[in-house]
């Protein structure tokens, strides 16, 4: 059991696709992809803290963001608890949005990745980034990349990440 007052706050980055190639359609309806992704200097802030409700609560400062079980951050919290066989004794996830919604910049996935990172630290489960990415991939294709950031090649449905040398600082229009 956690002690009351346990909380953590992180900034999570948006991403852009520098390249996306659809290789083939998979039997499950998804597509096998080859992508080059880059995190960018646009961030949401995620705070995870205990509550006394024995359930996950989502709070967000932006209209239109679902504050219920449809939220990717909420889904990631549930996936974490299930994968780690931990009873959710109550957490509040507060999202401060700066990454635009539905813009293809992985705002929801970044939020979910931030929740996984925070819960791993708060609950001291010591999962590796690869293990967190496996949990995240059950929720969304961009979550594994959002856990690592930087510049990376993403394969399959986005669940296989291979970091590459960072791009030089530049402007993208």
Task: Give residue ranges: language-model regions.
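Short, Lys/Arg-enriched N-terminal segments with co-localized hydrophobic residues
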Residues: 1-7
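ATP-dependent small-molecule kinase catalytic core of the GHMP/sugar-kinase superfamily
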Residues: 9-11, 17-35, 125-173
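N-terminal beta-alpha supersecondary unit
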Residues: 9-89
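Solvent-exposed beta-strand sheet faces enriched in polar/charged residues
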Residues: 19, 49, 59-61, 92-96, ...
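Short pre-catalytic strand/loop immediately N-terminal to key active-site residues, enriched for Gly-Thr
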Residues: 34, 91-104
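DPxDG-like acidic metal-binding loop motif
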Residues: 73, 103-129, 145-147
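Phosphate-handling active-site elements
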Residues: 81-92, 118-135
């Amino acid at each position: 059991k956690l002690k009351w007052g346990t909380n953590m706050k992180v900034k999570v980055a948006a991403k852009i696709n520098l390249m996306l190639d659809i290789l083939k359609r998979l039997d499950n309806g998804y597509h096998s992809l080859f992508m080059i992704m880059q995190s960018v200097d646009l961030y949401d802030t995620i705070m995870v803290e205990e509550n006394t409700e024995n359930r996950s609560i989502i709070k967000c400062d932006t209209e239109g963001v679902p504050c219920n079980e449809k939220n990717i951050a909420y889904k990631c919290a549930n996936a974490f608890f299930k994968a780690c066989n931990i009873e959710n004794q109550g957490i509040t996830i507060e999202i401060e949005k700066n990454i635009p919604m539905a813009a293809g910049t992985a705002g929801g996935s970044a939020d979910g990745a931030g929740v996984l990172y925070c819960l791993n630290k708060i609950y001291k489960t010591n999962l590796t980034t690869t293990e967190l990415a496996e949990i995240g991939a059950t929720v969304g294709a961009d979550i594994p990349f959002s856990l690592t950031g930087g510049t990376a090649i993403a394969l399959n449905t986005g669940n296989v990440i291979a970091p590459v040398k960072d791009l030089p600082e530049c402007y993208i229009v």
